[in-house]
Amino acid sequence: MLPTYERLNDPKNVFFRMPFARLALAALSLPLGGFFFCVVWSLLFDFVRSTYTHCDVVNYLPSVSAAIGNYEPQKTIWRLAIFLHLPLRLAVAKIYLEYYKEHIRRSRRLLGILACFLNVVEDLALFCLSFWTSADSYETHRNAFVVFIACSECYMLMSYLLNRNARKVVLLPHEEKSLRYKRNLFLVNVLAFGLAGYCFVRHNARCEAGVYTFFALFEYIVVLTNMGFHMTSYWDFYALNVVCDAKHGLYLTQF
């Protein structure tokens, strides 16, 4: 099999061709736009209900679960965004699988396959926790959330380490830029997740005014840094096209 960037294809057999940048932006814009819509709508039109806490202390921000899963039209908008973006995310995971097979040393290739598997499980867990909300099915939502977080953190760490330590060739400038973003976004994500966990435990233990607001804020940072991390694919596949043809299926090419 030829490397993805050298494959030649017959135009008659090509189903579609598009710049990878468009695919990356589409995969990000749907959940990002849905997330901001849900938070802003909740603050403007469902502030009292979405910021209510079990001990009725002062709170100024809805949690992610409250913003995206408890009220309409937020619930429908978020589900639609996740449903539409899932095929794009799975396509990107497939492209990364090809990328790791060609750019990662043979001795580390299984780790690349594992990273792609974790990415797919993360995507499916996000789908599940979005369609089975905490209000509708708490146990399913909780389990999907645990799987999502575990796979997300493991995937981000493995993706960073594979690109830093396991490559066969030297990083290009745009790949170095992607690697720096991966490192920084992963570190901020882990820190925000730890602080969100601390605020959640403290809120449940003490019911102090404003603590749940910080919990929600750190939740937002976790969500946004996760999206940002996946957006680094924009630089990983800089100036490449996504092609799907009858012979090779889905792959990347410079042509």
UniProtKB/Swiss-Prot annotation:
Superkingdom of source = Eukaryota
Is this entry keyworded Endoplasmic reticulum? yes
Q: Any one cellular component term from GO for this entry?
A: Golgi membrane
- Which compartments does it reside in? Golgi apparatus membrane; Endoplasmic reticulum membrane
Q: Which InterPro entries match?
A: Frag1/DRAM/Sfk1, PGAP2
User: Which GO BP terms, alphabetically?
Assistant: GPI anchor biosynthetic process
Positions of transmembrane segments: 25-45, 80-100, 111-131, 143-163, 185-205, 209-229
- One Pfam family name is Frag1
Keyword annotations? Endoplasmic reticulum, Golgi apparatus, GPI-anchor biosynthesis, Membrane, Transmembrane, Transmembrane helix
Q: What's the protein here called?
A: Post-GPI attachment to proteins factor 2
